[in-house]
Amino acid sequence: MSLITRLLTGNNTLRLRALKSLGKAGYSSHAKFSEHKPIERIRNIGISAHIDSGKTTLTERILFYTGRIAEMHEVRGKDNVGATMDSMELERQRGITIQSAATYTLWKDTNINIIDTPGHVDFTVEVERALRVLDGAVLVLCAVGGVQSQTLTVNRQMKRYNVPCLAFINKLDRLGSNPYRVLSQMRSKMNHNAAFIQLPIGVESNCKGIVDLVREKAIYFEGEHGMDIRLDEIPQDMRVESLERRQELIEHLSNADETLGELFLEEKPFTEDDIKAALRRTCINRTFTPVLVGTALKNKGVQPLLDAVLDYLPNPGEVENLGFIEKEGQDPEKVVLNPARDGKDPFVGLAFKLEAGRFGQLTYLRCYQGVLRKGDNIFNARTNKKVRIARLVRLHSNQMEDVNEVYAGDIFALFGVDCASGDTFTTNPKNNLSMESIFVPEPVVSMAIKPNNTKDRDNFSKAIARFTKEDPTFHFFFDNDVKETLVSGMGELHLEIYAQRMEREYGCPVTLGKPKVAFRETLVGPCEFDYLHKKQSGGSGQYARIIGVMEPLPPNQNTLLEFVDETVGTNVPKQFVPGVEKGYREMAEKGMLSGHKLSGIRFRLQDGGHHIVDSSELAFMLAAHGAIKEVFQNGSWQILEPIMLVEVTAPEEFQGAVMGHLSKRHGIITGTEGTEGWFTVYAEVPLNDMFGYAGELRSSTQGKGEFTMEYSRYSPCLPDVQDQIVRQYQESQGLAQPDKKKKKN
């Protein structure tokens, strides 16, 4: 048996031996023979879930069983090696995944590109980017925790990018695991048409194997690390349940799939292939979610999950990817990109992640159309800059393997390309083609930051420049009012991790100030303006008059700013309208009540006046400044604050204390549920009231409670909160005397 044959057909022990022999034979890795598969033999998948559901451990097992790594390490293992996919030192220390690591592997002659994504809410943008470029995903759920807040976030993101998914209920070996409850939560909370395609043979410490409902066989994982798979008859005590669950699976599938539905109604017999074909069709259409079970830590259920990835998730040719051709004054024209791996069409790729590596900036891309070879020239669609490809690499966590060419469907990386995440690259700069950009949420928390030593300022600047380029949710700016340098992001943990990375990677220890909330200011009702800007001081003067109305946008758009030109005729010449918009957007950076940005406002320019000599774009910009100051005085304003979705889980005996604390923090409780001595409460709480909650929860639940929160929306503040914010702002500006309250004896 040749080495290559042994690799493609042999079991994993043979495969590992073959890999070692190939290494001696001078191959860099199995990149050389997994490089160019036909499109049917490629899968681009992501592994997404709530924090601590076991994503990274599952990826580690997948890499081991597919022969990609020779030994396994745990996320917080005793050997201190850490998981392969957690390449950053900070990730291994904390046992969480911060960046989404990319790798690829081979299973049954199919090339699988895997992106392991973070589960912590503060790193949502990493998940967004990963899902944008994937064709399918594995949603990992904890058999104890079930559907948690971040699971719902990931589910929403999958819906946004239309990503088909398999569900894998992990951690069957944990005390209190209940996969049946998790399935009912998937149906009720996530609205998934879901059913088991596998059942566990025992749970907790009694977890022996799984039942495959499609093949009607029991699967046992034996030998060292569960590498030997033994098929057997379904245990006697599980046959009735297996038949019932198989019938339930067929009913759910028949509701979602026409072909199987007809067979079901005509009461014709089903074959295993009929069910598999229906599962594939419905999974790709997102009308059904197959649910698999297992425990990655105890090496059970991982190989059948890999088989399901090949059987039910789409290849790049089965997913429609659209490009948009921009045309002036028209809606962009949609173009379906050709996924064929033949290089006939021009190359189109999307940069979905940036990383500063040892050799300069590393840019992760997904190729959607055509072929890219070493030495080719490509153009950035946003900047029109030309880039020559000196080196193409494929990634295995933080190790690189050089390749000569990549085709549609491949995930790869380039060096030294100056771009931002979400940029489109093409070989033809004239076609104005771009992919839809990646959705980036607005930051909600800001903190003052300063280096501890003045000599570290250079390193501090380098770190800030790198991190803001890599992560679009991490912002950096200087506040002139308080003369402080501020960073803003998706949460306290997000900013703390960057502070620690500055110290570790750049030798620049920094001090973070207290967290500050990103409030917004908006109008309560419409306010008209008619403003004349006139300045004459010898020579040509300035003259501009604008008339219109500023009005609030609907609540679901209260983070946006809109500008509408409703002028008719030439009272306001069209070349001066951009000046009005520029003036409006400049003034929107700082409100009157609390100095925060304006949002949720539409500026309607309806009429005005100009002077044949004295009018200019600058004059109209200054007129917009004056008009908005007029609206500040005459309009009715309110402050908006970010509201967070909070999920708290704790033992039942602390339910009263937890609910009381949330109510005290102005929380609105939206739901509760209890199970086996534990309860979960869902609430909407203003972010401003959530600081310090972690410590309070720990002390009130004897350290047993835990909570997660994620941004939901902006909503008006309570009147007393607004008064307090306005007063604090006025005091900081020296506009009001601080309250001198009498001290109580």
From Swiss-Prot:
It is found in: Mitochondrion. Gene3D superfamilies: 3.30.230.10, 3.30.70.240, Elongation Factor G (Translational Gtpase), domain 3, P-loop containing nucleotide triphosphate hydrolases, Translation factors. Keywords: Elongation factor, GTP-binding, Mitochondrion, Nucleotide-binding, Protein biosynthesis. HAMAP family: EF_G_EF_2_B (MF_00054_B). It holds the Pfam family GTP_EFTU. Pathway: Protein biosynthesis; polypeptide chain elongation. Mitochondrial GTPase that catalyzes the GTP-dependent ribosomal translocation step during translation elongation. During this step, the ribosome changes from the pre-translocational (PRE) to the post-translocational (POST) state as the newly formed A-site-bound peptidyl-tRNA and P-site-bound deacylated tRNA move to the P and E sites, respectively. Catalyzes the coordinated movement of the two tRNA molecules, the mRNA and conformational changes in the ribosome. This is Elongation factor G, mitochondrial. Residues 40-317 form the tr-type G domain. Its main location: mitochondrion. The keyword Protein biosynthesis applies. GO terms for biological process: mitochondrial translational elongation. It comes from Drosophila melanogaster (Fruit fly). Coiled coil: none annotated. This protein may be expected to contain an N-terminal transit peptide but none has been predicted. GTP binds at residues 49-56, 116-120, 170-173.
